[in-house]
């Protein structure tokens, strides 16, 4: 019996030991699970990648204004109402858009109004200024305020004058100078219903630089100025008169393709002088127009706002013959200014490539 009691006591002790071991094992498992749970949270380390993405987004947003600032501005070119100006602008537009990637807007505006727009940056550049008519503008906007810049010569030499068909000189050689028109009977040959007894002097667009009314008054000529309204209107009147060999006296200029199409004679006026033109503001001009070295002007801020566009326009320079070839394509061949300019660009890469910055 005593042996049996001892045996039972040993069995119970073993059971208690097993229970303790099981409890210890369970506690150990829980501890390991807790440690393992901590390890399972390691994917949270991916958070910095998300933060980097957010930072990249913020950086992109911060960079956006910088990119916007780097966008090319629209270059606004002044187109004056004559064909030479139109083809100049068309050439510049092609190169600015195709070679430098600038958007270009062509603004039709008269040659006097353009100065105020250039001063404010509403216009970027004008590519054909005739200096004899713009002394006051140069003094105010370039020399005085410094808001417009002379960006160099275009190349062609221009000359405004009085013209009549050469057949009129053959009929009356005295008409080769202004003195031939001083005779009222001779001047009356150029009269129209609009001018009565006076001869008609056909001018162009009223916005053009022209001193003809002053010249006529100061020389005492029996002539009256009538504005045709445009270059095309002068050419139409010339074509009509020429086909009938009728008298016509008109304002025109070189370079222009009409001198290849028609036999014209420039009427001699008293020789140009600086002293004569010093009286222009008071209506005192009584002499010929000067030979003009055509030049280009730009908004003074263009150099900083669009340095490569500024460089191209500043370098732009070609010959009188270059310009006449494009004007002839428009006036004689019936092409648009854009078509004439593109043909010139296609044929003259050696010239314009030197303008590129």
Predicted regions and their residues:
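C-terminal motif of bacterial Sec signal peptides marking the signal peptidase cleavage site
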Residues: 30-34
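Bacterial signal peptide processing site
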Residues: 36-38
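Short, well-ordered beta-strand elements
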Residues: 70-84, 102-107, 198-202, 313
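Short helix-initiation/N-cap motifs at beta->coil->alpha
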Residues: 80-83, 103-117, 226-237
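Pocket-flanking alpha-helical
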Residues: 89, 109-146, 236-237, 257-262
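Ligand-binding pocket segment of bilobal, Venus flytrap-like solute-binding proteins
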Residues: 117, 123-128, 200-273, 278
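A conserved helix-loop-strand patch within extracytoplasmic ligand-binding domains
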Residues: 146-201
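A bilobed periplasmic-binding-protein/Venus flytrap-type ligand-binding module shared by bacterial periplasmic
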Residues: 159-170, 292-305, 328-329
């Amino acid at each position: 019996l005593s042996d049996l009691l001892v045996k039972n006591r040993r069995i119970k002790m073993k059971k208690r030991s097993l229970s303790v071991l099981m409890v210890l094992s369970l506690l150990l498992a829980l501890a390991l699970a807790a440690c393992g749970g901590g390890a399972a949270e390691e994917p949270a380390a991916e958070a910095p990648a998300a933060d980097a993405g957010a930072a990249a987004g913020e950086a992109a947003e911060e960079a956006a204004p910088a990119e916007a600032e780097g966008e090319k501005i629209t270059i606004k070119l002044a187109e004056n109402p004559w064909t030479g100006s139109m083809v100049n602008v068309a050439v510049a537009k092609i190169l600015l858009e195709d070679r430098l990637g600038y958007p270009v807007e062509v603004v039709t505006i008269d040659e006097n109004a353009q100065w105020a727009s250039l001063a404010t940056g509403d216009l970027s550049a004008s590519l054909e200024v005739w200096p004899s008519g713009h002394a006051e503008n140069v003094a105010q906007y370039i020399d005085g305020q410094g808001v417009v810049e002379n960006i160099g010569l275009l190349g062609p030499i221009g000359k405004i004058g009085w013209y009549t068909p050469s057949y009129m000189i053959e009929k009356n050689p005295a008409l080769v100078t202004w003195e031939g028109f001083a005779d009222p009977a001779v001047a009356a040959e150029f009269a129209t219903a609009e001018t009565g007894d006076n001869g008609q002097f056909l001018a162009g667009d009223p916005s053009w630089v022209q001193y003809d009314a002053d010249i006529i008054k100061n020389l005492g000529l029996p002539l009256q100025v009538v504005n045709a309204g445009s270059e095309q209107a002068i050419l139409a009147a010339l074509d009509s008169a020429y086909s009938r060999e009728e008298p016509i006296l008109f304002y025109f200029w070189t370079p222009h393709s009409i001198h290849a199409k028609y036999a014209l004679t420039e009427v001699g006026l008293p020789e140009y002088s600086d002293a004569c033109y010093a009286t222009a503001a008071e209506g005192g001009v009584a002499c010929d127009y000067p030979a003009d070295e055509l030049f280009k002007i730009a908004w003074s801020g263009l150099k900083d706002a669009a340095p490569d566009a500024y460089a191209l326009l500043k370098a732009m320079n070609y010959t009188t013959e270059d310009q006449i070839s494009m004007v002839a394509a428009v006036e004689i061949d019936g092409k648009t200014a854009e078509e004439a300019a593109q043909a010139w660009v296609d044929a003259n890469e050696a010239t314009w490539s030197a303008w590129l910055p």
